[in-house]
């Protein structure tokens, strides 16, 4: 038994006591410490080795305040000092002593006699993390037997993880675009010319994430299609979970859909063109708002069902019919003065943007995605996105 399946902010004393009652042993994802770490250089190096070994392998919980014999917890030895100050001290040590930095969360769980400190280390998708304290330059990994220093071959494997994930993400996008363009989407689309948005958790290629199907099939607000306030129809399918924009099942066509794959990857597709005097137009400003706003919502929806960051966000346009980019803001009466160039290819696949955490708001999301949005504008002949003011603020509406 471990605690990783329980959100850190929901862990209570009963969960702590269950570890003792079930004699849950130390593994590659859980380590017990009787006392917190001291203040000497040796103590710092031990702490950094412990947390970096978790980050470089599978992630896990470092639990301070357990007396254990041969890795089996026997009793709690609660921390009785200022737990906020101690957590801040340890988090500061991790920030200053490792490169690159790791993702670390902490919680003090109240128990009889004091607190148990839990440091939750996320599995890193940018390994390996090395100890830079006093120029140590050492790497650590972890197995069921404890932490160890990886050999050359193991280090090489760690160094290639991030590029491998990038390649898998791009390959997934390419495969999906081919299928959608050929008519092999999970629904029959109303239009062939579409915006395709992918949100790819880095964990997606490790394992299939267990999706909460029973909850999803009752939730019309999460993972809803672009351009809709909520889903109009929901369906469990072979690939995972499908949300659709059309509530009329007899119509059998969809303007937009969201496919949540079992690994946690999300694909959101929406009709792209607007038409004026019969000419198909790409309303760039509205497309940019759709990308930023929906990417933010999808990342937050993923986090809510336990599929954690980092996430790669990718946006693409499928433009089977020749169209013209238009840079008018919604409601701008002089839209015909805001024309850009014509499309010159059937597909635009813009560069991915990496998020280490789900953005708190559309502003933060759009600013992070500025390079992608600029690339979209440049595809239509504009030097940069027209959705940002001179101070960098993203224009969300008028």
Language-model segments: which ranges?
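Bergerat-fold GHKL/Histidine-kinase-like ATPase
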Residues: 1-62, 67-70, 152-398
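Divalent-cation
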Residues: 4-11, 74-134
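Sequence-level motif detector for i,i+2 pairs with an aromatic at +2
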Residues: 25-27, 101, 114-116, 136, ...
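Short hinge/gating elements
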Residues: 33-38, 72-80, 134-146, 277-281
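A signal for specific C-terminal beta-sheet/loop modules enriched in small/flexible residues
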Residues: 79-93, 136-148, 217-225
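Hydrophobic transmembrane alpha-helix bundles
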Residues: 95-110, 130-152, 341-368
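Hydrophobic, helix-rich cores of sensory/ligand-binding and other regulatory modules
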Residues: 105-184
